[in-house]
Each structure stands twice: as structure tokens, then as C-alpha cells.
Amino acid sequence: MNTENLLKNNNVDHEEIAKFEAVASRWWDLEGEFKPLHRINPLRLGYIAERAGGLFGKKVLDVGCGGGILAESMAREGATVTGLDMGFEPLQVAKLHALESGIQVDYVQETVEEHAAKHAGQYDVVTCMEMLEHVPDPQSVVRACAQLVKPGGDVFFSTLNRNGKSWLMAVVGAEYILRMVPKGTHDVKKFIKPAELLGWVDQTSLKERHMTGLHYNPITNSFKLGPGVDVNYMLHTQNK
């Protein structure tokens, strides 16, 4: 997709795209800006695979795939994976890394709304990780994800809660004190309360199945899933 087509799409934040374009070459640097994504990927993958009853042989869509960290890991589990993103550079990095790794992933520069118009009801599993807070209309993304999954299929979302603690942890702590992610990565005004996300889900054919928090311990420098959704959280939904 060229720049002209990108500008035509309404549900794209060009400043957000530019942020990730600027650091795309370091997406697979395990000690770089995306180190936290590499660290939490096994937790995400395990949660998705367990809640979906395994990924082997399933058709999976990763919305907002970036450089392909989660998409590749799901393909390694035996899934047929398509990765969507609107960033040209991250997709180029994802394609090259998949080629070097011998992993088959179909990467497409397209919005989820455009993809839903052509591929409704075609996926067993849809994942949308840390993407909703980077678009102007996150509800539109939720709606499109619901359209893309098969009846009985699974849709997973992850995002950041909007409150004082999440601002302190995800912005002040992660960006300015611990420097885990680049400054300016997050805008607390775009964070999404669980009740808001569940409200959008309720307006689709999806049904909530499970919600869990993703927690970081700065003392042990480790991540874990568990109760409490006051900062990062993941939501498992299923199509009716």
C-alpha cells in the first residue's frame, strides 16, 4: 500500500505509525526498544494457545502485528498466520525476519476494517495486542475483529487501563525511569478502561470469556499473568 492509500484511511493515526516506523529496524533486537515485547511474548502466546485450545492447524489473524514477534511465534505453533499492520517499515522487517527464520507468515499492509470487508468469518483466532490504544477509533477495530472470526472462534485483545496507576507505571516508570520503551510511546488519554472495551465487545457478536492482568515486577525484573487489571490486561472473547 502506498502513501496515498494510507492517507485515505480514516482509522489511522499517522503520528503513531511514524513512531514505529522510526525504530522498525530494531524490532528483533532483544536488548532494544522492543525488549519488553520479546519478554512478554511467551506469556501472551501461552495464554492465547491455552484459551483457544491450541493453535495447530488453525487460521490466525494478528492485527497490528508490527515486526512480527507474536505472529511468528504463533506460526511456529503450527498456525497459518496472517499479520496486518499499516506501518510499511515494520512489515518489511517482519517479512525479512520470517524469511531468515524459515517461518511462513502472510504479512499485509491493510487496516483491519478493510480486511474484514474482504475476509469476514474466515479466521479461527484473531489477536489484537497493544494496538487499540494507537488508533483514533478503537471500537471500529473491535467491531472488525468480530466480523473476521468464525462462529465459535476466539478473539484476543490486550491494552492498557486508563487511570493514575497505569500512567505512573506505563508512562513515567516504563518510559522515563526504567527506559524500557521509547519516550512518547504511550498517551494515557488513549488508554482504555476494561468497562469501555467490554462495552464495545457487547455491541458485537463476541462474548467475554476471561480477563487477566499482565504484571511487571521491577525488583525481580519479571512479568507474570494474574488477577488485577489496573495497568496492562488481556481479554479473551469468543464469537457466538
UniProtKB/Swiss-Prot annotation:
GO MF term list: 2-polyprenyl-6-hydroxyphenol methylase activity; 3-demethylubiquinol 3-O-methyltransferase activity; polyprenyldihydroxybenzoate methyltransferase activity
GO BP: methylation
Signal peptide segment: none
Catalyzed reactions: a 3-demethylubiquinol + S-adenosyl-L-methionine = a ubiquinol + S-adenosyl-L-homocysteine + H(+); a 3-(all-trans-polyprenyl)benzene-1,2-diol + S-adenosyl-L-methionine = a 2-methoxy-6-(all-trans-polyprenyl)phenol + S-adenosyl-L-homocysteine + H(+)
Binding annotation for S-adenosyl-L-methionine: 44, 64, 85, 129
Keywords: Methyltransferase, S-adenosyl-L-methionine, Transferase, Ubiquinone biosynthesis
S-adenosyl-L-methionine recorded as keyword: yes
Pfam annotation, one family: Methyltransf_23
Function: O-methyltransferase that catalyzes the 2 O-methylation steps in the ubiquinone biosynthetic pathway.
Protein's recorded name: Ubiquinone biosynthesis O-methyltransferase
Gene source species: Escherichia coli (strain SMS-3-5 / SECEC)
Gene giving rise to this polypeptide: ubiG
